[in-house]
Amino acid sequence: MTDADNLPRHRSSRPPLPDALGKLCTEGKATAQYLWQVPDDQAARAKIVTILNQIAVEAQKQNRKEMGRDVTELLTAAKASPSPQQVDLLVGGFDRLIKLWQAAKSGL
């Protein structure tokens, strides 16, 4: 028996393949990050609201209640007047959504 046989087997560190919910979360984060460059871009803000509404629908289909709560908070932030704090809140919120999605997909 070698030392390699005695080592615990670890899960793969690769992120799960994105489904519709994962793609929406990733797209939302990218759009929110874009707001650092152009904070007053109304089209990007409207896109974020649309993405958040789609995430809410997908999360409900998958019974992901914790994601629904985050989406509600992010919708409020997305509709607020543009500011660096708002962009930071949106980017951080999409990060949380991505982590919640990854945890659900990995079985945690």
Enumerate the predicted regions with their spans:
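Extended, amphipathic alpha-helices with heptad-repeat/coiled-coil or helix-bundle character
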Residues: 42-81
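Amphipathic, coiled-coil-like alpha-helical segments
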Residues: 2-35, 58, 62-65, 81-108
